[in-house]
Design a protein with these regions (language model features):
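C-terminal ends of transmembrane helices
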Residues: 6-11, 57, 104-117, 165, ...
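Acidic (Asp/Glu-rich) catalytic motifs at the cytosolic membrane interface
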Residues: 1-27, 48, 162-185
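Intramembrane alpha-helical segments
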Residues: 28, 54-145
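Multi-pass membrane catalytic core of lipid/isoprenoid biosynthesis enzymes
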Residues: 22-89, 181-216, 253-254
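Extended hydrophobic alpha-helices typical of membrane-associated regions
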Residues: 213-270
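Membrane-embedded alpha-helical segments that form the functional core of polytopic membrane enzymes
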Residues: 1-9, 96-107, 147-167
Length: 270
């Protein structure tokens, strides 16, 4: 729910700032066809100056900013209630401070007068909160401790989360530059940014593989799911290299799920 709240908040903030203006809507019209091309089914790419296609933004599509902000608030409230339930069950009252930090980080990403997502810090905060804080916090709530495996798992999940953000920012690199939104992708450029995003996925897989190889006798289910994770990350990397960002995003997401499943297998079959 906190993730959903952050997405609504980002849509609201970017919408009222005008950052989402001119961004294309995700559809099958990512190719323009000439009359002669229609008969041969050969697509002609749109000029490079036109914006990359992405999902529709709510505020930019005409939805009332107040409604989007209300949706963010409702999901944040549900997240808070879930967090308070965890606190009540575990007795770890300091989790409230962690929750407050997560709420502030979610809003200040692109909200407020000085959003850190506009000043090259978005990737770092995503690594910390979507990776280490989320994973290690969950582990501590369940087990009362944080192990080396938990830290490594948090780093891996965080790397893939940053890769997802990089794919989004690669798609929007031109419009972000126009509206003064400074991300690592606007600094690196599309070519170097593509290499960086692929490197993030590669490092995540290599860390996971190294951990599994350090096990005395990795179980076959663990190796099998590791292979699936590698395949998904490879497919995502190919999609990123081909600038098919709409395909790369779900592949990165499923790679994160497969990575988590691999760690579960490591624990179950240890």
């Amino acid at each position: 729910f906190l993730q959903v709240a952050a997405n609504f908040a980002n849509d609201y903030s970017d919408g009222i700032r005008g950052t989402d203006e001119g961004r294309a809507v995700d559809s099958a019209r990512s190719f323009a066809k000439t009359p002669s091309a229609e008969s041969t089914s050969t697509p002609e790419m749109l000029p490079a100056s036109q914006p990359q296609h992405g999902p529709a933004r709510l505020v930019a599509s005409g939805v009332s900013p107040k409604k989007v902000l209300a949706a963010a608030g409702i999901n944040a409230l549900i997240a808070c209630l879930c967090g308070l339930a965890v606190v009540a069950l575990t007795g770890y009252w300091w989790f409230i401070l962690v929750g407050i930090a997560c709420l502030v980080a979610g809003w200040c990403y692109v909200g407020g007068k000085h959003p850190y997502g506009y000043h090259y810090l978005g990737e770092i905060f995503v690594l910390v909160f979507f990776g280490l804080v989320a994973t290690c916090g969950t582990m501590f709530a369940l087990a009362g401790t944080i192990s080396t495996e938990g830290m490594l798992g948090g780093a891996n999940v965080g790397l893939i989360a940053v890769a997802v953000l990089c794919v989004n920012n690669l798609r929007d690199v031109e419009t972000d530059r126009t509206h003064g939104k400074h991300t690592w992708m606007t600094a690196l450029g599309r070519r170097n940014g593509t290499v960086f995003a692929i490197a993030l996925l590669s490092v995540a897989v290599l860390l996971l593989a190294a951990y599994i190889l350090l096990l005395s006798t990795p179980a076959m289910p663990t190796i099998a799911i590791l292979a699936v994770t590698c395949a998904m990350c490879a497919a995502a990397a190919v999609a990123i290299a081909r600038k098919k960002y709409g395909e790369a995003l779900p592949l990165c997401t499923f790679s994160s799920l497969a990575l988590a499943a691999t760690y579960v297998c490591c624990v179950v079959f240890a």
